[in-house]
Amino acid sequence: WIMGHMVNAIAQIDEFVNLGANSIETDVSFDDSANPEYTYHGVPCDCGRTCTKWEYFNEFLKGLRKATTPGDSKYHEKLVLVVFDLKTSSLYDNQASDAGKKLAKSLLQNYWNNGNNGGRAYIVLSIPNLAHYKLITGFKETLTSEGHPELMDKAGYDFSGNDEIGDVAKTYKKAGVTGHVWQSDGITNCLLRGLDRVRKAVASRDSSNGYINKVYYWTVDKRATTRDALDAGVDGIMTNYPDVIADVLNESAYKAKFRIASYDDNPWETFKN
């Protein structure tokens, strides 16, 4: 999965997919009542990027729905996965469940079209703080109470705080999550980060008792780092330059081993090295 980073304006969906992304990452900020409000990152952000592009969250979802609904004039067949980077640090811990409930309602109405031919992309809810695990339970409860438990098949989870792998595993247990797990590792492109924890995450993914289905590394803009991440066995790379990742995947060393994921590739299925 080539994951376009910080896609917060509807116009950027086309831009990133046309550069080679089959997945996008979108920031979601919340208001004081735990309603998802804007797709907005703010300052500071990655080096070389404009930090302030935004939409109202529900409007972004409508644009995203068009981009992922077959037959729509804005449809992109290859856009198959969306990571919502949930900026929950503005919330109190006890608001996490409410945030999950409200997120589910927004997605149900504006993205999944109340279960009636909505957008088809898989969704990953990426949470920066292990203490906010009740966001997941609130999200699932709401899809069930609103009559659409089947949409949980389209949703997965990620804790993005670079926590100890063992602590993340314990948190999923508390949240009742037994699958659909992506594990991120990374840092802003302005700084360097080694691949030690990525390798641990990949080892956990490939073990018989690991909780991880997929591992992705962020934010990668250089060819050399892309090669290092691929050599470490990641499933996804988040980038500001999807064309760079696509170029490396075309190199003879990687062409035989990797391909770009399509809609038929289940993002919740573990593919071991």
Swiss-Prot record:
Note accompanying the cofactor annotation: Binds 1 Mg(2+) ion per subunit.
Entry cofactors: Mg(2+)
UniProt-listed InterPro entries: PLC-like_Pdiesterase_TIM-brl
Catalytic function, reaction form: an N-(acyl)-sphingosylphosphocholine = an N-(acyl)-sphingosyl-1,3-cyclic phosphate + choline; an N-(acyl)-sphingosylphosphoethanolamine = an N-(acyl)-sphingosyl-1,3-cyclic phosphate + ethanolamine; a 1-acyl-sn-glycero-3-phosphocholine = a 1-acyl-sn-glycero-2,3-cyclic phosphate + choline; a 1-acyl-sn-glycero-3-phosphoethanolamine = a 1-acyl-sn-glycero-2,3-cyclic phosphate + ethanolamine
Record-annotated active site: 5, 41 (nucleophile)
Top EC group: lyase
Localization in the cell: Secreted
Function field: Dermonecrotic toxins cleave the phosphodiester linkage between the phosphate and headgroup of certain phospholipids (sphingolipid and lysolipid substrates), forming an alcohol (often choline) and a cyclic phosphate. This toxin acts on sphingomyelin (SM). It may also act on ceramide phosphoethanolamine (CPE), lysophosphatidylcholine (LPC) and lysophosphatidylethanolamine (LPE), but not on lysophosphatidylserine (LPS), and lysophosphatidylglycerol (LPG). It acts by transphosphatidylation, releasing exclusively cyclic phosphate products as second products.
Stated name of the protein: Dermonecrotic toxin LdSicTox-alphaIB1ai
Source organism (scientific name): Loxosceles deserta (Desert recluse spider)
